[in-house]
Amino acid sequence: MQNINPTQTNAWKALEQHQKDLDQVTIQQLFEQEPTRFNDYSLKFAEQILVDYSKNNINQQTLSLLRQLAKECALNEATEAMFNGEKINRTENRAVLHTALRSCANTPVYVDGKDVMPEVNAVLAKMKSFCQRVISGDWKGYTGKAITDVVNIGIGGSDLGPYMVTEALRPYKNHLTMHFVSNVDGTHIAETLKKVNPETTLFLVASKTFTTQETMTNAISARKWFLAAAQDESQIANHFAALSTNAKEVEKFGIDTNNMFEFWDWVGGRYSLWSAIGLSIALSIGFDNFEQLLAGAHEMDNHFRTAPMEQNIPATLALIGIWNCNFLGAETEAMLPYDQYLHRFAAYFQQGNMESNGKYVARNGEVINNYQTGPIIWGEPGTNGQHAFYQLIHQGTKIIPCDFIAPAQTHNPLSDHHSKLLSNFFAQTEALAFGKTQQEVEAEFVKAGKSLDEVKEIVPFKVFTGNKPTNSILVQKITPFTLGALIAMYEHKIFVQGVIFNIYSFDQWGVELGKQLANRILPELTGDESISSHDSSTNGLINQFKAWR
């Protein structure tokens, strides 16, 4: 990947001037100027996903300049480098090939001259066989009973992705009950173990190195709990499987290495649900549905790699995001799924985006000080969010671009619930884009029989300025295929932005310092002696903790 400062490109300079020219033009005026705006500013994927980006502060010149920016920043070359297995994660000297995990085409993909696809397919075949045994009841626990509960123990990418997907695809789940334990807080594992029976519980320990502090702390506690009931260490093999690459540590734990599912250093944690880390997904929804999840992602990979920029959904969303955060002053993006099954979608991409693009050092090692990199990602399902934080989005002083996501078909057609849900979905983006003028507020009062004189003091509070940017993503139905495509769409959006931000999106050095300091502090917490080895604040906090515990 090349080292190109985006602010030094001709397109960036032109965009700065263009922003000034467009500054006083509202979204409403853009719709008035362009009668076919919806058709011109929306794209479809596989006739199952519609992405409408018309309610943004952009026109065709904006898009043209943003596409020029992508070209000047060598996006196409970077995309091919990723798909071809080049080591684009330079700080760790790794390829980035989560796309290979879902490559249904079986086209060879080379890393260091070796085709990785045979190994990928071998792990998938092993996962399929394992899932069939557990789901069918052939796999027995230590008392001869079939498995009823699966506990996935992992953190970060080993937890957020599998948890999000199993929740999103609950309509497809089988009889197995899934549990996810991530936090090193003992409460998380303790409360989970209260719900399960050691005779019928399978634990998946998800840690590439099998040394992750939080994961192994929880796994050891689960092991102790299990052995207290089973009283036989040889039975660990029937109740624990490992998603790891460290066979030595897995075996030491007591897990049969036949029940160890590998993945590779070219799979980043936050892009790993497509790998063996997704075993909990496959156990929950069945392997056929897991393959559909992969197929949807693969289809989006093909779209992203081959569609021209004008029709390229991930690239378009990425470029609009760059426009919003670097030219319009937005600092956050809200992800608002109008689907309760997607209640962890924003949390998943909070990690996906912020761990990838939350960087301040450019690819040449220099500090970035004249443009913004990754935005803050947050969100909640609709309509819950409407009764919580939408007030600020509508009438606050900050610009918050929003992605509204909704399925046209529901899995639970109860009464008129879905129509009411979707009426809110459509209404919110309309309200955010077009607002309500003072004249409209006054007209409402007059219609209600009020005189303008008696309401003049309240009128300003009921005005909505509008002109708030949104994308609307309408999915025909949330299925394994469409969910896979949606996830891959956002993955590639993050990639595009990282290329243009001139950063390395696939490392996460920012998580290391806190870990190092925690390892230093941990032994200091054992005794009763006063601590003085830190700053006065940290010393004071540790010493108060010791006094109170």
Curated annotation (Swiss-Prot):
It is found in: Cytoplasm. The active site is at 355 (proton donor), 387, 515. One of its GO terms (biological process) is gluconeogenesis. Keywords: Cytoplasm, Gluconeogenesis, Glycolysis, Isomerase. Transmembrane segments: none annotated. Its main location: cytoplasm. Pfam families: PGI. It catalyses: alpha-D-glucose 6-phosphate = beta-D-fructose 6-phosphate. The keyword Isomerase applies. Its EC number is 5.3.1.9. GO terms for molecular function: carbohydrate derivative binding; glucose-6-phosphate isomerase activity; monosaccharide binding. PROSITE patterns: P_GLUCOSE_ISOMERASE_1, P_GLUCOSE_ISOMERASE_2, P_GLUCOSE_ISOMERASE_3. GO terms for cellular component: cytosol. Pathway: Carbohydrate biosynthesis; gluconeogenesis; Carbohydrate degradation; glycolysis; D-glyceraldehyde 3-phosphate and glycerone phosphate from D-glucose: step 2/4. It is an enzyme of class 5 (isomerase). Belongs to the GPI family. Catalyzes the reversible isomerization of glucose-6-phosphate to fructose-6-phosphate. HAMAP family: G6P_isomerase. This is Glucose-6-phosphate isomerase. It comes from Histophilus somni (strain 129Pt).
